[in-house]
């Protein structure tokens, strides 16, 4: 069992005061703008960011590709160009960025003995040398995008909206994203190394667990049910000192089923004595079109489920310590193909050509956007 963790909201509130001290009138005067977010699945353009701004999107969850930004073992050879663009466009419109850091470079995977060349993304760092590379990269990322970071000094005309919360990995309970198979002990080491690196630069930064999908592979091994993974993670001594937030990805055909998943997360957290930890619902969504799938609910069904979910989580925001809810996804990406996720290509609030869907109208009822 663990003791209740101290809250670290104060510094975050101060950091966001200038840009995010707008509140959502339609959701009640106490709801911060950052509560309502979206996650990206398609490349984002200026037009995407402009539309997000008018829709009053508060948080943008996006991926920082470690493999893309750190392509070789040469010290300091970071390529921040794509992340710079995304962070800058978001900041210019007052949108808070919540990054999840994922995708192991081939040279780092090789340190752990993996021969995967260009398919190493999900081979999370495990050994001392690979974890040292992980720490170095996160240190550099916070130095660039955190408070007073290099990106802000290089772009003085961009409103400073530093990244204060960092999500470490993605769906680590699934073999799709954590190879060769999910490993609680291995993830705990990744988490501890990440926490050490990030807080050494920004001691008020918040660390969010990688989002966890309820039942990878339909509950079959080597996938681990999210609540079981979380419970085993809590069994690691001192682990609650390494993170501040838990991130469900409660995908289900019906919202009632998604809610049951969130409740199971909360049960595990409370049982571990960590009921004060925040919930960041970093992915939640349904599709409006595409191939037959339980999560394809059609245009109106998608909008109805968004309304149902956002209404509930808004109501329970304080009771459940919910920091934000990010809809997956912002824009359709039919070119991605069905792949591992048959419904994802049409999960956007807007179509591929940025035409509003009914679900965007539902979203803006909560944000007072247009």
Describe these PLM feature segments.
Residues 5, 65, 171, 212, ...:
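Flexible loop residues that form catalytic
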Residues 46, 50, 135-164, 182-303, ...:
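Noncatalytic carbohydrate-binding groove/subsite architecture in carbohydrate-active enzymes
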Residues 29-59, 63-65:
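Boundary/entry segment of secreted carbohydrate-active catalytic domains
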Residues 12-23:
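Bacterial N-terminal signal peptides
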Residues 1-13:
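Bacterial N-terminal signal peptides that target proteins for export
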Residues 55-220, 238-241:
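Substrate-binding cleft and catalytic face of glycoside hydrolase catalytic domains
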Residues 117, 123-125, 162-167, 172, ...:
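Aromatic-rich peripheral "rim/lid" segments of glycoside hydrolase catalytic domains that contact
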